[in-house]
Regions:
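Polar, low-complexity loop segments and adjacent catalytic/binding residues used for recognizing
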Residues: 1-122
């Protein structure tokens, strides 16, 4: 497995594995169950400039594919793209595959997320 150029820009946490051409968010431990992985930008994105009172503007594009690790078992949960205070960036161990890798108890500072939820919770 070679180093992909994306690793110059992002860091993996949890069960992330980097393969040339893609990032597998749950593939590092080869266990598709109860697995959570996260990548984050190496450089902090400032959303507000307090000196100029200006908000930041940015664009992002990516493609995603949520596929089963085992052909007869459908993928569960999904993934989320989110903006978060760097102090809250640790992958919570107690989540064990649920919650789309989002932080616990972030209500005091808040965060913005777009979820791609693939699991119907009854």
């Amino acid at each position: 497995m070679g180093r992909d150029a994306i690793q110059d820009y992002v860091t993996g946490m949890g069960n992330v594995s980097f393969t040339l051409g893609y990032v597998d968010l749950t593939g590092k431990n080869n266990d598709p169950f109860e697995s959570t992985g996260r990548i984050h930008n190496r450089k902090q994105l400032l959303l507000w400039n307090s000196a100029t009172q200006q908000a930041a503007s940015f664009s992002c594009s990516f493609s995603l594919s949520i596929v089963p690790a085992i052909s007869n078992i459908p993928p569960a949960d999904g993934m989320a793209f989110f903006l978060l205070d760097p102090k809250l960036s640790d992958v919570p161990d107690e989540r064990k595959g649920c919650g789309l890798g989002l932080p616990l108890n972030a209500h005091s500072t808040g965060f913005v997320a777009v979820e791609f939820d693939t699991y119907l919770n009854p």
